[in-house]
Every structure is written in structure tokens, then in C-alpha cells.
Amino acid sequence: MWFVYALGSAVFAALTSILAKIGIEGVNSTLATAIRTAVVLLMSWGMVFLTGTQTGIAEISRRSWLFLVLSGLATGASWLCYYHALQVGAASKVVPVDKLSVVITLALAFVVLHEPFTAKSLIGCALITAGTLFRVL
């Protein structure tokens, strides 16, 4: 089932890039990011209340809170950079560079989370990097 959700994420991320590029025209990128974030906030809390999972807030550990907040800060920084890049660059070039996050995530998963880094992972990272460079240079 994880694959279905991951594929859905990829489809929606692709739509996000195109919709954002169209919507950001003539709008300050920081303001556009704030508007997008407000929509995401409303949608996320709507899902929490729709599914009745708001009661789980009290059970979240301090460690989880810390890393969720850090993740939120990283997301905010990512979105601010992404929207500015989209505003000044072509979506067909910005998006592939943004997707280098896959390579960075695999490296961090290996170093921080001690996940296995196989020959298959290395080849995949090399292909993603080469494809990105081929596309944007």
C-alpha cells in the first residue's frame, strides 16, 4: 500500500510544480509560499479532525515533537527556496534540481538512520544525478 501513496505523492508533487509556476506569476515568492502553506495547514488539520486522530496529540513524545518541529522548519526552508527558484527559473529545470533531494535523502538515510546503501542505491543515485545534470546543463 505504501507504493500507492508514494505514487500519489509523485503525481500531486508534479501537479504542485505546474500549478505553482502558473500561480506565482506576478506574486512575491515568499507571499506565495505563505498562501500555499496556509492551504496545506487547513487541509492537514481538516484530515486530522475528519479521521478523529486529534486525540493523539497528548501522546506524542518530546523527541517526536522535536523532530516534527525540525522537519517543519526544513519543509518551510525548502518551500521558500523552491518557490523563489520557480519564480525566477523554468519549471523544467527547477524541478529536476529539486528532485536531487532523493539522492541527498538516500545519503542521509545511510549516515543518520544507518539504512543499507547498496550497489543498487549507488547506481540509482548516480543515474538521478547524471539525469539532473543532463537536463539542466
Task: Report each predicted region and the residues it spans.
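Hydrophobic residues within membrane-embedded alpha-helical segments of Major Facilitator Superfamily
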Residues: 5, 12, 19, 74-77, ...
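Glycine-/small-residue-enriched transmembrane alpha-helix faces in small-molecule transporters
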Residues: 1-31
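Membrane-interface interhelical linkers
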Residues: 1-8, 27, 40-68, 79-88, ...
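C-terminal transmembrane-helix exit sites in multi-pass transporters
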Residues: 103-122
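Hydrophobic transmembrane alpha-helices of multi-pass small-molecule transport proteins
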Residues: 44, 120-136
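Helix-helix packing/entry segments at the starts of transmembrane helices
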Residues: 31-38, 80, 86-106
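Hydrophobic/aromatic residues within transmembrane alpha-helices
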Residues: 23, 32, 85, 111-113, ...
